[in-house]
């Protein structure tokens, strides 16, 4: 199974990606996590994309496309995967289509998680993440508060409001998202791949709707070889 998750920030793509990974044995691929790691490590890429992400702007297509292409060209390329945060633009979708053709792979579905902007702002602005780069666990001041205010349950590190979780940044990111998403979804609708899902429902209901949209495929059962490899 090969999937793309589309949705604004705060729509729950990461959470649903985790559930899809657990059920179907997929590899989760998130460009946002890749870039945050590069920023934390102070790499050349991190220095390039850091200011853009801080302002709520999209990373240029050529940079994102190359990061993803390197992953798929490598010896351990993913065969079954769920993409979280890529492609985000029509140009990225075209580049990804070309990359998959070169690798003799094809997408099975594009899951579109829809949610109102104000709900996105409410969700993200309440998020607090562990400042420890080794940990990075995130909480929510209302929906998932830590046991001790301002302190990570996992490692005890301080919880902070990340720059890209501030309201002004969120609204800029939403503007960028809406500007690019119509053409992206039209591209995939023409291929018959889009499955629309209401992301305002409960996490369990959203996941059930995703499974329905995918035709309720059976859960993945690893072979003995795959079990030993893991």
What are these regions (language model features)?
Residues 1-230:
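Glycine-rich phosphate-binding loop of ATP-dependent small-molecule kinases
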């Amino acid at each position: 199974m090969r999937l793309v998750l589309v949705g604004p920030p705060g729509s729950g793509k990461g959470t649903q990606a985790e559930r899809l990974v657990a059920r179907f044995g997929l590899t989760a691929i998130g460009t946002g996590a890749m870039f945050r790691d590069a920023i934390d490590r102070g790499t050349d890429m991190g220095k390039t994309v850091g200011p853009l992400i801080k302002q709520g702007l999209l990373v240029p297509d050529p940079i994102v496309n190359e990061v993803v292409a390197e992953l798929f060209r490598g010896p351990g390329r993913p065969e079954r995967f769920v993409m979280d945060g890529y492609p985000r633009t029509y140009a990225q979708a075209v580049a990804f289509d070309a990359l998959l053709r070169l690798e003799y792979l094809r997408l099975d579905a594009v899951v579109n998680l829809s949610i109102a902007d104000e709900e996105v702002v409410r969700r993200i602005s309440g998020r607090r993440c562990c400042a420890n780069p080794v940990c990075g666990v995130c909480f929510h001041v209302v929906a998932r508060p830590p046991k001790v205010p301002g302190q990570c349950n996992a490692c005890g590190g301080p919880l902070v409001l990340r720059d890209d979780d501030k309201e002004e940044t969120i609204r800029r990111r939403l503007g960028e998202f809406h500007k690019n998403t119509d053409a992206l979804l039209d591209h995939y609708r023409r291929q018959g791949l889009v499955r629309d899902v209401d992301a305002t429902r409960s996490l369990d209901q959203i996941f059930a709707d995703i499974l329905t949209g995918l035709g309720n495929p059976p859960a993945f059962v690893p072979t003995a070889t795959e079990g030993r490899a893991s």
